[in-house]
Amino acid sequence: LTLRTSIVGPELKANGEGLFHWFMHQEKQCLGYKTAIWGGVTTLELAKVVDYVIQNPITGLVQVSNGEGINKFDLLQLFKEIWHSGIEIVPVDKNGIDKSIARSQRLAYEVPSYKQMFIDLKQWMDGHISLYAANYPMEQGR
């Protein structure tokens, strides 16, 4: 089985390189590209998919996505909303690239909406603060 996707989520290393890590370390404002489209899953959602395919084996190439693209501006807005960030996200209409991923119909697992994935991720992080507190500004119930 090959799972093809793109992931976003917290990193355990201090000098993380991903979009979530980058956003969580911004101080005042950042750019949000309205024409750059992403279509993956959170790291937590990928773990759920891996657990699912272990229990429900399939073979071949499976693309893991909810089948909907989201632009980076809206993605950062979800981070801001769910993690209660005061960062100003400035919309930018350039850098048009579509990295959305079509959902494989063979995978019976239903990937939720982006908002739900990030709500779930926030709850997971809040429940496992000791894993993330060193690298991310976190408060219980925030």
Ranges and model annotations:
Residues 1-3, 62, 112:
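Hydrophobic/aromatic beta-strand patches that form the interior of the parallel beta-sheet core
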Residues 1-38, 44-45:
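NAD(P)-dependent short-chain dehydrogenase/reductase
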Residues 10, 39-40, 94-99:
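A short acidic, often aromatic-flanked loop/helix-cap motif at beta-alpha or helix-coil junctions
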Residues 13-17, 75-77, 101-103:
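Short aromatic-enriched loop/helix-cap "lid" or pocket-rim segments at secondary-structure transitions
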Residues 38-41, 70, 112:
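Residue-level signal for the nucleotide or nucleotide-sugar donor/cofactor binding architecture
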Residues 47-99, 129-141:
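Mid/C-terminal beta-alpha module of Rossmann-like enzyme folds, strongest
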Residues 112-142:
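Amphipathic terminal alpha-helices
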